[in-house]
């Protein structure tokens, strides 16, 4: 915390000095400023109260790239503030390894996430993407956003943001993010036996010229995520379902192994308005990713591995990737139709530690986006076309009565699916592109204090690639079909003092696909809470419960060597029902929560598995604070 305060003070005075120096440098100006010092001080004192959440807004870098110009006011709501992990923010629609900051897999969306070729080491992408999509601020005053999570059993999280406007046209700032989680199973000491160490630093600059013809942003992101793995609880399949969960007293399957995912991103965006409704732009992004898996205890962990190919003493596998992405484009509007047309070039190279030479991939594609919007009705479409014939089309329609979307595309295999060279696995494939069709539709009924939205999603994938039970990639030649039905429900009761929110998924997997797509049939997440304002309507509060239910299924397992999830059919994850009880309060710019996670674990040795061999978080008290500072 001292380091954060020192850094914020340093940047504050550095920028404050710069902004003062640029107001004028001659002696007459200095004298004039001296004469007006008292009056200006009085003005400053009288206007301090003006700065706050109503005067502070931001825009995302992704919005700027697409041509959106709307700034969003900083969040001051208590809703869902108690959810500090991505796992909970996504309403537990993911698998993880039972701890804050561990690798994630989406339960219901098995379609490709990238049109560009990616590394395939994507289980930590959610943590990276939260930081990568920069927020550029219009602050009117210096602004600090501090979020501190003090989780029980050695789980902590800190997010610190400092930003300020140098003047009306320039904004500068930095983010610091930190996750530190102790092991929840197989710890060798009561405190400080780390499972996750994650840190990120992001520096950003945003500029808009006085005549609003030029927009520029630039950012540098340094991301480092370390997982000190355990391999999960050491048990025999015939002992399932487990009656006693020993957590930190458990024997684990791996000792002293380490995964590292280090990424850097340099991004520069430039936009120039040639005509009132016509702009040209360029975006350049340099990205690196360094992946490693280290096991210095190979002789003790040997039973975990299916094979050892090169070194019988230690495993020191690594993978390095770098890419230079360029986009140039035009965007504007004609009547109510907004357009964005662009060309992309991506030069990518990669190398495993056992390779003698780097491999290169050149990607070229063109694309375009169209958007029509009138009142609450909008239509969006986008298409990307690669030189090799692959494509991606996305269409969306939204209005007050229904939402619909359709996605169709041919996607290249990622690097990991096609090629891997390490101490425990080797493969070299020439997989075909994956074909995806996805149709989603939902109806919205919004009447007084009731919102109800039934939905359906139909997914077909041809040439689907997955990691088999032997932890190697396989391409399925047949068409895979699975459907997800469900609904969202929101109720306000007793003049909205009691609120109920519910999200339900019902999954239907085709008979020929059940051995490949493993999802729970039923998945439900509810939030029931009391909301009011105490102390003369000055302090908003919420008190309630989160309820999570997942039906039994053979969930995907996780392999730290390839840092990916793979299918299995021997370890069944049983039905489980979990509740969290929370209390939230807001005092001016300070928000506070207290939450009893896994409240319904009344037996110390009770529990459930969230992923094969990895128990879900046991009962623990979590505390959190989020504080905005202005001026």
Task: Map each language-model feature to its residues.
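Flexible loop and strand-edge segments within Gram-negative outer membrane beta-barrel domains
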Residues: 194, 204-206, 212-269, 289-301, ...
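Short hydrophobic/aromatic-rich motifs at helix boundaries and adjacent loops
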Residues: 103, 115-118, 129-134, 173, ...
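Gram-negative bacterial Sec-dependent N-terminal signal peptides
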Residues: 1-22, 26-28
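Exposed, low-structure sequence patches enriched in small/polar residues
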Residues: 4, 9, 19, 141, ...
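Intrinsically disordered, low-complexity boundary segments flanking structured domains
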Residues: 12, 129-135, 529-533
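Short structured motifs
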Residues: 130-131, 157-160, 253-254, 313, ...
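Membrane-proximal, glycine/serine-rich, low-complexity loop/turn segments characteristic
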Residues: 19-240, 257, 272-278, 398-402, ...
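Structured extracytoplasmic
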Residues: 91, 95-109, 299-305, 319, ...
């Amino acid at each position: 915390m001292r380091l954060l305060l020192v850094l914020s003070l340093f940047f504050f005075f550095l920028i404050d000095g710069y902004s003062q120096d640029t107001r004028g440098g001659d002696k007459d100006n200095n004298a004039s400023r001296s004469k007006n010092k008292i009056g200006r001080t009085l003005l400053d004192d009288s206007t301090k109260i003006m700065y706050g959440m109503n005067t502070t807004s931001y825009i995302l870098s992704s919005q700027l790239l697409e041509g959106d110009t709307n700034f969003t006011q900083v969040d001051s709501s208590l809703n869902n503030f108690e959810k500090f992990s991505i796992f909970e923010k996504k309403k537990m629609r993911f698998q993880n390894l039972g701890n804050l900051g561990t690798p994630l897999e989406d339960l219901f969306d098995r379609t490709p996430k990238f049109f560009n070729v990616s590394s395939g080491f994507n289980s930590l992408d959610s943590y990276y993407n939260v930081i990568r999509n920069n927020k550029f601020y219009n602050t009117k005053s210096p602004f600090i956003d501090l979020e501190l999570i003090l989780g029980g059993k050695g789980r902590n999280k800190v997010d610190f943001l400092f930003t300020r406007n140098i003047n009306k046209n320039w904004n500068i700032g930095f983010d610091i993010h930190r996750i530190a989680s102790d092991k929840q199973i197989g710890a060798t000491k009561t405190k400080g036996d780390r499972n996750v160490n994650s840190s990120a630093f992001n520096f950003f600059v945003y500029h808009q010229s006085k005549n609003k013809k030029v927009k520029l942003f630039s950012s540098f992101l340094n991301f480092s995520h370390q997982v000190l793995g355990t391999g999960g609880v050491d048990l025999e399949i015939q002992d399932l379902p487990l009656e006693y969960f020993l957590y930190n007293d458990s024997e684990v399957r791996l000792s002293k192994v380490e995964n590292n995912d280090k990424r850097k991103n340099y991004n520069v965006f430039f936009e120039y308005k040639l005509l009132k409704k016509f702009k040209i732009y360029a975006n350049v992004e340099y990205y690196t990713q360094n992946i490693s898996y280290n096991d210095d205890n190979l002789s003790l962990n040997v039973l975990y591995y299916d094979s050892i190919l090169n070194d019988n003493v230690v495993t020191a596998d690594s993978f390095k990737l770098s890419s230079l992405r360029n986009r140039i484009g035009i965007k504007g509007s004609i009547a109510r139709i907004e357009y964005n047309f662009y060309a992309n070039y991506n030069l990518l190279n990669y190398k495993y530690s056992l390779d003698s030479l780097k491999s290169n991939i050149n990607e070229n594609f063109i694309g375009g986006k169209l958007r029509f919007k009138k009142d609450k009705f909008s239509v969006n479409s986008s298409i990307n076309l690669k030189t090799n014939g692959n494509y991606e089309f996305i269409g969306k329609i939204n209005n007050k009565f229904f939402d619909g979307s359709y996605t169709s595309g041919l996607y290249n295999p990622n690097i990991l699916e096609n090629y891997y060279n390490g101490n425990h696995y080797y493969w070299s494939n020439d997989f075909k592109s994956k074909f995806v069709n996805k149709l989603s539709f939902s109806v919205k009924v919004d009447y007084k204090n009731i919102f109800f939205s039934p939905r359906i999603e139909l997914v077909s994938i041809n040439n689907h690639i997955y990691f088999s039970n032997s932890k190697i990639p396989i391409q399925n030649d047949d068409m895979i079909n699975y459907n997800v039905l469900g609904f969202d429900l929101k109720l306000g009761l007793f003049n909205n003092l009691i609120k109920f929110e519910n999200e339900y998924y019902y999954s239907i997997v085709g008979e020929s696909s059940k051995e490949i797509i493993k999802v729970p049939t039923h998945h439900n997440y509810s939030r029931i809470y009391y909301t009011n304002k105490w102390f003369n309507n000055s302090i908003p509060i919420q008190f309630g419960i989160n309820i999570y239910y997942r039906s039994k299924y053979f969930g995907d397992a996780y392999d730290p060597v390839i840092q990916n999830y793979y299918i299995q059919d021997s370890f069944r994850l049983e039905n489980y029902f979990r509740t969290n009880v929370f209390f939230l309060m807001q005092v001016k710019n300070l928000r506070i929560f207290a939450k009893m996670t896994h409240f319904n674990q009344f037996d110390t040795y009770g529990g459930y598995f969230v992923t094969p061999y990895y128990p879900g978080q046991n009962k623990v008290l979590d505390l959190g604070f989020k504080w905005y500072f202005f001026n």
